[in-house]
């Protein structure tokens, strides 16, 4: 009998129950999960992964939060057009110790500014991180195009410093438990 808790970091739902569960005493943590790595690998193989870092610069200040949300909204629109399911899409903007985050956690949800920076900036480091059920090369093309579109609309320029797009390989766990006696 394994307890199942519904927990939301966004709303706080379920945290009281989690604290109560963690406060219990007893012999816990001995159950070894039987993970089917073939099924896991099949699911991972459907995803295109993209990790990128960028440098933006403009002559006039622009609202960092609006830019972050604009990039995610543009990407969400392109994914919807292709019926490409977003498993994870996050754009982070960093400027002089401040940062903001916009994300999309499902194609059924709307893009949101999950952490506002409340900054007007001329330069910013930006990170785009995506896991989408699509071809990784297509994902890279779309990210490049939509970032450029969002940046151009603010009279800024962008330098893509690092971009990696790929499909993950089959997981090979380093440590495994032997069921033994």
Task: Locate predicted features.
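P-loop NTP-binding site
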Residues: 27, 31-181
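Canonical P-loop GTPase G-domain recognition
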Residues: 1-44
């Amino acid at each position: 009998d394994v307890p199942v808790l519904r927990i939301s970091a966004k709303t706080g739902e379920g945290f009281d129950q989690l604290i109560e569960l963690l406060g219990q005493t007893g012999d816990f943590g001995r159950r070894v999960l039987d993970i089917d790595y073939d099924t896991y690998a099949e699911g991972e193989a459907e995803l295109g992964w993209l990790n990128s870092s960028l440098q933006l610069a403009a002559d006039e200040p622009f609202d960092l939060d609006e830019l972050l949300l604009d990039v995610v909204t543009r990407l969400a629109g392109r994914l919807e057009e292709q019926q490409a399911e977003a498993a994870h899409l996050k754009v982070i903007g960093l400027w002089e110790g401040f940062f903001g985050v916009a994300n999309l956690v499902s194609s059924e949800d709307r893009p949101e500014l999950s952490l506002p920076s409340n900054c007007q900036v001329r330069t910013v480091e930006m990170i785009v991180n995506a896991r989408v059920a699509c071809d990784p090369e297509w994902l890279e093309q779309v990210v490049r195009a939509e970032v450029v579109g969002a940046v151009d609309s603010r009279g800024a320029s962008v330098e893509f410093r690092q971009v990696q797009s790929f499909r993950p390989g089959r997981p090979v766990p380093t440590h495994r438990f032997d069921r033994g006696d």
